[in-house]
């Protein structure tokens, strides 16, 4: 059993339907499988919805290894647009991560990369979400 490292992952998000809306999702967790967690986030579509004043972050990923309650300690938005009755679907613009075995995080150890969702991935996700919510989100 490996010793877990403290990891911080920052995901810069852009609203698919409003390019002016940008948010930064910060996830702090203890895991010795940072590369798996990073890969999972890189393949993820992130949906946010606000219910009763609480912002829920829903991560859907095609990876076999997903962030789960066992390793995610804290997940919060440092900037978050006001959500009304619905939610927002985000694409990941940039992801940075940092991991230290001694528990101290240093911005100098960040690794950055960017991605863009394909149209087919987005359509598939919208169909899943439409089914989940009970109404059609596709334009």
From Swiss-Prot:
It comes from the Viruses. Pfam families: Pneumo_NS1. InterPro entries: Pneumo_NS1. Keywords: Host cytoplasm, Host mitochondrion, Host nucleus, Host-virus interaction, Inhibition of host adaptive immune response by virus, Inhibition of host innate immune response by virus, Inhibition of host interferon signaling pathway by virus, Inhibition of host IRF3 by virus, Inhibition of host IRF7 by virus, Inhibition of host MAVS by virus, Inhibition of host RIG-I by virus, Inhibition of host RLR pathway by virus, Inhibition of host STAT2 by virus, Inhibition of host TBK1 by virus, Inhibition of host TLR pathway by virus, Interferon antiviral system evasion, Modulation of host cell apoptosis by virus, Viral immunoevasion. Its main location: host cell. A motif (DLNP) lies at residues 136-139. GO terms for cellular component: host cell mitochondrion; host cell nucleus. It is found in: Host cytoplasm; Host mitochondrion; Host nucleus. The keyword Cell inner membrane does not apply. GO terms for biological process: symbiont-mediated perturbation of host apoptosis; symbiont-mediated suppression of host adaptive immune response; symbiont-mediated suppression of host cytoplasmic pattern recognition receptor signaling pathway via inhibition of IRF3 activity; symbiont-mediated suppression of host cytoplasmic pattern recognition receptor signaling pathway via inhibition of IRF7 activity; symbiont-mediated suppression of host cytoplasmic pattern recognition receptor signaling pathway via inhibition of MAVS activity; symbiont-mediated suppression of host cytoplasmic pattern recognition receptor signaling pathway via inhibition of RIG-I activity; symbiont-mediated suppression of host cytoplasmic pattern recognition receptor signaling pathway via inhibition of TBK1 activity; symbiont-mediated suppression of host JAK-STAT cascade via inhibition of STAT2 activity. Belongs to the pneumovirus non-structural protein 1 family. Plays a major role in antagonizing the type I IFN-mediated antiviral response by degrading or inhibiting multiple cellular factors required for either IFN induction or response pathways. Acts cooperatively with NS2 to repress activation and nuclear translocation of host IFN-regulatory factor IRF3. Also disrupts the association of IRF3 with CREBBP. Interacts with host mitochondrial-associated membrane (MAM) MAVS and prevents the interaction with RIGI. Interacts with TRIM25 to suppress TRIM25-mediated RIGI ubiquitination and thereby RIGI-MAVS interaction. Monomer. Homomultimer. Heteromultimer with NS2. Interacts with the matrix protein M. Interacts with host ELOC and CUL2; this interaction allows NS1 to form an active E3 ligase with ELOC and CUL2. Interacts with host IRF3; this interaction leads to the disrupted association of IRF3 with CREBBP and thus reduced binding of IRF3 to the IFN-beta promoter. Interacts with host MAVS; this interaction prevents MAVS binding to RIGI and inhibits signaling pathway leading to interferon production. Interacts with host MAP1B/microtubule-associated protein 1B. N-terminus is important for IKBKE/IKK-epsilon reduction. The DNLP motif has IFN suppressive functions like binding to host MAP1B. This is Non-structural protein 1.
């Amino acid at each position: 059993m490996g010793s877990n490292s403290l990891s911080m992952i920052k995901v810069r998000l852009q609203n698919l339907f409003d390019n002016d809306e940008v948010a930064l999702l910060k996830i702090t967790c203890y895991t010795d499988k940072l590369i798996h967690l990073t890969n999972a986030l890189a393949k993820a579509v992130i949906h946010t919805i606000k219910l009763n004043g609480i912002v829920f972050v829903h991560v859907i990923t095609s990876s076999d290894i997903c962030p789960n309650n066992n390793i995610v300690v804290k997940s919060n938005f440092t900037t978050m647009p006001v959500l009304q009755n619905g939610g927002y679907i985000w694409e990941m613009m940039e992801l940075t991560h940092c991991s230290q075995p001694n528990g101290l995080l240093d911005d100098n150890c960040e690794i950055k990369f960017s991605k863009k969702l394909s149209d087919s991935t987005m359509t598939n996700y919208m169909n899943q979400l439409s089914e989940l919510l009970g109404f059609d989100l596709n334009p």
